[in-house]
C-alpha cells in the first residue's frame, strides 16, 4: 500500500466523542476513532468514578460502559459493570476478622437482570452462624432494592453507596462490622434479552 493510500485512510478516519449514560449525567468518557460508524458499536470503555466526578478519592471504583448507539460525531453508551479495585479490597482485609461475601442475581422493576456482589468486613472473627446471618441479610436487602427500583436507580444506589450503607446498618445488629461494600455489579441481560430467554423457555416447556 502506498504512503498516499495510508494517508488517505487516516484522513477518512473519524473521531467519536464517547458519552456516559444518563445515570452518569452524560459525562464525556473520551474519544474513539473509526472508519465507519458501524465499527464503533459494542466497543467498551473503562474509567473510574473518580475521573467522572473529578474526585480522586473515588478512583478505587472502576466503571465499564459499552457503546450502543452512534450519532454523527457522538457515541452513546450503556452501563455494563461496576467494580472495586483489588488493591482497595485487599486494604480492607484484616487479620483476625471475617470477610463475608455473596453473589446475588436480581431482576429490576424494568426487567434488567443484574448480578450484585456485596461484601462485609467484621471487626473481629465471626462464627459460622453469624456469617450466614450476615450473608442472608445482604442477599435480602439486595433483592429488596432490585424489586423496588429501576435499573438506573439500582446502579445509582450502588455507586453512590446507599445500598452498602443500608446493608451495614442492618447487618451490624448481627455482629459488629467495620465496612460493607458492593464489590462488583454486572449487567447480565437487558429487558429484550430477558424476554427472549423467557419466550425460549416457554417454547421448550411446550
From Swiss-Prot:
Pfam family, one: Ribosomal_S3Ae
InterPro entries linked to this entry: Ribosomal_eS1, Ribosomal_eS1_arc
Gene Ontology MF annotations: structural constituent of ribosome
HAMAP family hit by this protein: Ribosomal_eS1
Regions annotated as coiled coil: none
Keywords annotated in UniProt: Ribonucleoprotein, Ribosomal protein
Any one GO biological process: translation
Stated name of the protein: Small ribosomal subunit protein eS1
Single GO cellular component term: ribosome
Family: Belongs to the eukaryotic ribosomal protein eS1 family.
Disulphide linkage map: none
Top-level taxonomic group: Archaea
